[in-house]
Amino acid sequence: GLTAADKTLIKSIWGKVEKETEAIGVEALVRLFKCFPQSKVYFDHFTDLSPSSQKLHAHAKVVLGALTKAVNHLDNITDTLHDISLVHAKKLLVDPVNFELLGHCLEVALAAHFATDFTPEVHLAIDKFLYEVEKALFETYR
């Protein structure tokens, strides 16, 4: 789980992330599609997956908005993300491995945007946070 120190580091970096959520989200999604093209199958209704795509920008806001909610509820990530998990598991039928892949892409985007602030300690805390998010999203797949 997340330690008190992890939570402090996560909230600190996320204060900076919130000022650039759309750009970071778009960068992470574009990287996901380039590095893991199989993930595009869930976005076949998007005619444009380029960084300028309005639909991609909108989805980036939704994804980062959900992560912001999780940051604001670090002691209860599973309940916080329950509805999102349910939609992805039962309606959209997303292979849950994609959450982990997007997490990796998000970590790269954070490191690129916040090179000075993304210390090894922050990286570890964010990695642990994203693991908790992934576990929460996996919850309704059972």
Swiss-Prot record:
GO CC list: blood microparticle; haptoglobin-hemoglobin complex; hemoglobin complex
Tissue-specificity statement: Red blood cells.
Pfam families (alphabetical): Globin (PF00042)
Chain positions recorded as heme b binding sites: 88
Annotated Globin domain residues: 1-142
InterPro entries linked to this entry: Globin (IPR000971), Globin-like_sf (IPR009050), Globin/Proto (IPR012292), Hemoglobin_a-typ (IPR002338), Hemoglobin_oxygen_transport (IPR050056)
UniProt record similarity statement: Belongs to the globin family.
Protein name: Hemoglobin subunit alpha
Gene that encodes the chain: HBA
